[in-house]
Amino acid sequence: MARRRRAEVRQLQPDLVYGDVLVTAFINKIMRDGKKNLAARIFYDACKIIQEKTGQEPLKVFKQAVENVKPRMEVRSRRVGGANYQVPMEVSPRRQQSLALRWLVQAANQRPERRAAVRIAHELMDAAEGKGGAVKKKEDVERMAEANRAYAHYRW
C-alpha cells in the first residue's frame, strides 16, 4: 500500500499558437532531454505539413487522431489463487488521453520518414483517418480486452 498522499495532477498551460492544453501535452510527449522548444517546433512544422497536404484545420485533424486512438478497454493483470489473469477494465478518460498521445508519438517514431515533423504529420493524418500504427495498437489492446471477457468478474 502507498504510504504517501496521491500526487496531485499538475495543470498544463495552453500552448501559444492554438491555446489548447491537449497540444501542450502532446508537445511534452514529443520532447526529449528537456528540449521543449525543439519539440514545439516539430509539432508546429507537422501542423503546417497537415495544412498543406489535407487543406484541413491541423487542430481538427490532431483532435480527431487523438479521439481515434483512445482505448475504451484494456487488460490489467490480477493475481488470484496463484494464477495471473488478464482482467479487462474500462480506461479512465485521463489515462485514455495519456495512452493515445504516447502511442501516437511511439508510432510516429517507428515510421521510415527521416524528419520528425513529417513522421508526426503522417501519423496524425493516418490516425485521423482510422489507420496507422497508433490505431493498430489501440485495436490490439481492445482485442485483448475482448478476448479476456471471461475474466471480467475478477474486476476490482
Swiss-Prot record:
Keyword rRNA-binding recorded: yes
GO molecular function term, any single one: structural constituent of ribosome
The keyword NADP belongs to this UniProt entry's keyword annotation: no
InterPro entries to which the protein is assigned, alphabetical: Ribosomal_uS7 (IPR000235), Ribosomal_uS7_bac/org-type (IPR005717), Ribosomal_uS7_CS (IPR020606), Ribosomal_uS7_dom (IPR023798), Ribosomal_uS7_dom_sf (IPR036823)
UniProt xrefs under PROSITE patterns: RIBOSOMAL_S7
Gene3D superfamilies: Ribosomal protein S7 domain
Pfam families associated with the record: Ribosomal_S7
Keywords recorded for this protein, A-Z: Ribonucleoprotein, Ribosomal protein, RNA-binding, rRNA-binding, tRNA-binding
Annotated Gene Ontology cellular component terms: small ribosomal subunit
Record GO biological process: translation
Assembly with partners or alone: Part of the 30S ribosomal subunit. Contacts proteins S9 and S11. Binds to the C-terminus of IF3 and to the C-terminus of Era.
Task performed by this protein: One of the primary rRNA binding proteins, it binds directly to 3'-end of the 16S rRNA where it nucleates assembly of the head domain of the 30S subunit. Is located at the subunit interface close to the decoding center. Binds mRNA and the E site tRNA blocking its exit path in the ribosome. This blockage implies that this section of the ribosome must be able to move to release the deacetylated tRNA.
Family named by the database record: Belongs to the universal ribosomal protein uS7 family.
UniProt-recorded name of the protein: Small ribosomal subunit protein uS7
Organism field: Thermus thermophilus (strain ATCC 27634 / DSM 579 / HB8)
Lineage: Bacteria, Thermotogati, Deinococcota, Deinococci, Thermales
UniProt gene name: rpsG
